[in-house]
Regions:
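ATP/NTP phosphate-donor binding region
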Residues: 1-62, 72
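Glycine-rich beta-strand-to-loop/alpha-helix junction loops that act as flexible
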Residues: 9, 65-67, 89-92
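Short glycine-/acidic-enriched loop or helix-start segments at secondary-structure transitions
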Residues: 15-16, 73-75, 98-100, 206-207, ...
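Catalytic core of DAGKc-family lipid kinases
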Residues: 31, 40, 80-196
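Internal helical hairpin/lid segments
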Residues: 194-242
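Residue-level detector of conserved catalytic or cofactor/ligand-binding positions
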Residues: 248-256
Length: 256
């Protein structure tokens, strides 16, 4: 098997490429194994590098070194290639995807990633792209778009950037008109705050909107958040973060 590490030097708050190389060398040298380390130079290039590796036809394990966005790019690069497996060596600010698994700490050890068995997981398809974890639409998606600029602030964590972006976007309107149709035939239409399609459970620096979601059960868990006003936002965000929106009757988690 070929081992390829794809590094996003822009992930997190500093370039960790040299640190990654030291850790990889320490794990691979005693085993007499070789590897390649590829560094992305532009947004979207991790996907291109992953696709090129998969197209070689060799059995390959790709290690996405960066944040959740880096992992997403690498996954999108290998969809449809059975010779390629993907894992994650986290180096972002949120690193939420690994929280799907029983032992997230295992992903911080190169040795344990080398020894790990492969498993198959579901993906969310949106137009021509795929997601492993969560797909959000509406207010939350706008919040996610603005997170990057808040992450640049000193002493702001991934979760802190998410919270700041929430309150910034509150000033630009909370709702929009949507129609959501599930495979079951159930339809949600009208003014909605956001729609969250969950294959995994954690995102946004620690938000857990649907605790029941499992990435290998063949189902997507859909959470539709109804229209809320500014006075409700703080309560909604708190319940949304903890996966308790159904308790305040403004959402309906369903499985298509």
């Amino acid at each position: 098997m070929k081992h390829i590490f794809i590094v996003n030097p822009a992930a997190g708050k500093s370039d960790r490429t040299a640190e990654y190389r030291e850790m990889i060398d320490a794990a691979f040298a005693p085993r007499g194994l070789s590897y390649e380390l590829l560094v992305s130079g532009a947004p979207g290039e991790c996907r291109t590098l992953a696709r090129q590796a998969a197209q070689s036809g060799e059995e390959v394990r790709l290690y996405a070194c960066g944040g959740d966005g880096t992992l997403n790019e690498v996954i999108n690069g290998v969809v449809g290639y059975d010779n390629a497996a993907v894992t994650h060596f986290p180096g972002g600010s949120g690193n939420d995807t690994i929280k799907i698994f029983d032992d997230p700490a295992a992903f911080t050890s190169i040795e344990r990633l080398l020894d790990a068995e492969e498993a198959r997981f579901d993906l969310i398809r949106c137009n021509d792209s795929y997601a492993l974890n969560v797909l959000s639409i509406g207010f939350d998606a706008r919040v996610g778009t603005d997170i990057a600029r808040f992450k640049r602030l000193p002493l702001v964590s991934g979760k802190g950037a998410y919270i700041l972006s929430i309150f910034s976007n509150m000033l630009h309107g909370l709702t929009a008109d949507y129609t959501v149709t599930l495979d079951s035939g159930k339809v949600f239409s009208g003014r909605k705050t956001m729609i969250c399609v969950c294959n995994g459970r954690w995102y946004g620096g620690g938000f857990n909107p649907v605790p029941e979601a499992e990435p290998d059960d063949g189902l997507l868990d859909v959470l539709v958040v109804e229209k809320v006003n500014l006075l409700q936002v703080a309560t909604v965000v708190g319940h949304y973060q903890k996966g308790r929106l159904s308790l305040i009757h403004i959402s309906e988690p369903t499985r298509p």
